[in-house]
């Protein structure tokens, strides 16, 4: 579950239980090291060894989960969880607002030039198109381009979209596969589709994504 959320950029706050601190390293029943286990699937993972740490660590974990759209894990040993503590003042938490990312003008102009010369353009939409359904349909209308969606883009672009031709990928349809196979310009919007054999062999591929990696 947490690995899926990490991969799909879903903000999650997870509190993972741990054995009593006095038993760590002594081959205790079902002993693991949660702070190591969860590092691979989180952007924040900290161990609470004193109850006084909890308010500030909780504050930072929530900021990390929402700000990074990722998983934040707090590891809480059983003995620490039952300790009493006095709280003088709680951190003031305001929900962070995600930044609005704007592409470079030069990149937009270069993309527009490719779209002007493309004869068979296909739009390939993923989860990054959330909230942009109308814009995707309008772009498809202007380009007269079919819209193919990835599995996670289905709920954002398929409905009420006369240009949608279905999904591609391991669970996709022939129509979606053919629309990509036969295009000369593929515009990937909000997807990092990993299945290389489904990409066109001789087309220009333009990727619009918030993550440049």
Whereabouts are the PLM-identified features?
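N-terminal alpha/beta PP-like core and its mobile active-site loop of ThDP/TPP-dependent enzymes
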Residues: 1-213
């Amino acid at each position: 579950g947490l690995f899926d959320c990490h991969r799909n950029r879903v903000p999650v706050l997870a509190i993972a239980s741990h054995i009593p601190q006095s038993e760590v390293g002594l081959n205790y029943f079902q002993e693991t090291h949660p702070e190591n286990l969860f590092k691979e699937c989180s952007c924040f993972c900290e161990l609470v060894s004193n109850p006084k740490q909890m308010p500030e660590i909780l504050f930072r974990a929530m900021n990390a989960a929402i700000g990074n759209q990722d998983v934040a894990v707090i590891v809480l040993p059983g003995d620490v969880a039952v300790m009493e503590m006095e709280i003088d003042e709680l951190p003031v938490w305001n929900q962070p607002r995600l930044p609005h990312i704007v592409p470079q003008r030069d990149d937009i102009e270069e993309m527009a030039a490719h779209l002007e010369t493309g004869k068979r353009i296909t739009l390939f939409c993923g989860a990054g198109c959330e909230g942009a359904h109308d814009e995707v349909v309008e772009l498809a209308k202007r380009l007269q381009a079919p819209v193919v969606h990835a599995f996670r883009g289905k709920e954002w672009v398929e409905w009420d979209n006369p240009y949608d031709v279905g999904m591609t990928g391991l669970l996709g349809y022939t129509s979606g596969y053919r629309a990509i196979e036969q295009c000369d310009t593929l515009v990937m919007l909000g997807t990092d589709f990993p299945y290389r054999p489904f990409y066109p062999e001789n087309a220009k591929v333009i990727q619009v994504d918030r993550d440049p990696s």
